[in-house]
Amino acid sequence: MKLSCLSLALAIILVLAIVYSPHMEVKALADAEPDAIGFADAFGEADAEPKRRRGLKKIIGKVIKGTGKVAGEAAASAVADAAVSAAIDAVVGTTEEPEQ
């Protein structure tokens, strides 16, 4: 009984391998990018990464820098407003806590 189950499992694996191997081969031939990256890595070329990924990294970097700049300006504005409010309170003589 164990031998027939093992034979059945191996037969199913063999059939699946035969059925799906042409599909995988076509898919591998259609996408040449992994081959190019593997070739560049194998020969130690510095430009192993596709140009579109480098472009995407530049765009993401610019977005992060811009977001950081806006957040920094907002924080500086909030600190400046709190300082002005504290200075006015000191001159006027109120003892209210500044809003946070």
UniProtKB/Swiss-Prot annotation:
Its main location: secreted. Glycans are attached at residues 85, 94-95. Pfam families: Pilosulin. Expressed by the venom gland. Very highly expressed in the venom apparatus (5%). Neurotoxin that triggers pain behavior and inflammation in mammals, and is paralytic and lethal to insects. Causes a time-dependent increase in cell leak current. May act by targeting membranes. Belongs to the formicidae venom precursor-01 superfamily. This is U-myrmeciitoxin(01)-Mg7b. It comes from Myrmecia gulosa (Red bulldog ant).
